[in-house]
């Protein structure tokens, strides 16, 4: 992200690209290695890169997503040229500005300035069994009393940090990434991570692991 809020990518990423860009990136490493500006978006303050997609947050709290054009899409049935187009999500443009964003293997998550959380994409890590998986949908009952300040996304799981330093998670915990000790466990609704350190300041999710920064007690 540049000082002007412009985003540059390189490697196998055809986000906001057109026509035969995908084929060129696959066959020409010189072209793939060159930084390319993503057209159609500025004023970006945060970008997160997942396995198949990118998500952007602007200073106004707007949220955009696009797919890289490689290895599939987040639960969507679309061809590469359509899916690599930049998409603005209107739910974050009318008094519901986002404060943080993340993308995992094939899902998206965003927290708002009001402390709420929206998820969409592949159903494994959305923390809900209702709503449209292809559109940002509010996590309602299970997180209604919590104020979430940041989010992070792993392969098929999501982590949410509240302002009192509590970590919640949802999705796969087959490798203990949600703090559970039961092999193969999955959670369709958010759970509190009982094994997390106290007074957490920040949390991040990786492929099948997680890390946190805790305040000195």
Q: Where do the protein language model's features map onto the residues?
A:
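Eukaryote-biased RCC1-like beta-propeller repeat architecture
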Residues: 1-217
């Amino acid at each position: 992200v540049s000082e002007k809020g412009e985003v540059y990518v390189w490697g196998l990423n055809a986000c906001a690209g057109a026509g035969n860009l995908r084929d060129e990136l696959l066959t020409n490493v010189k072209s793939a290695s060159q930084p390319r500006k993503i057209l159609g978006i500025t004023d970006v303050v945060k970008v997160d890169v997942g396995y198949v997609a990118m998500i952007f947050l602007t200073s106004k709290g707007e949220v955009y997503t696009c797919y890289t054009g490689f290895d599939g899409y987040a639960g969507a049935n679309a061809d590469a040229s359509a899916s690599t187009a930049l998409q603005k999500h209107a739910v974050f443009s009318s008094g519901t500005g986002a404060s943080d964003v993340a993308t995992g293997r094939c899902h998206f998550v965003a927290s708002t300035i009001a402390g709420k959380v929206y998820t969409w994409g592949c159903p494994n890590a959305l923390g809900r069994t209702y709503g449209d998986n292809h559109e940002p949908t509010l996590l309602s009952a299970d997180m209604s009393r919590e104020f979430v300040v940041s989010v992070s996304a792993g392969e098929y799981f999501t982590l949410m940090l509240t302002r009192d330093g509590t970590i919640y998670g949802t999705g796969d915990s087959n490798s203990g990434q949600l703090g559970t000790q039961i092999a193969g466990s999955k959670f369709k609704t958010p759970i509190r991570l009982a094994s997390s350190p106290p007074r957490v300041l920040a949390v991040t999710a990786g492929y099948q692991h997680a890390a946190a920064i805790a305040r000195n007690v």
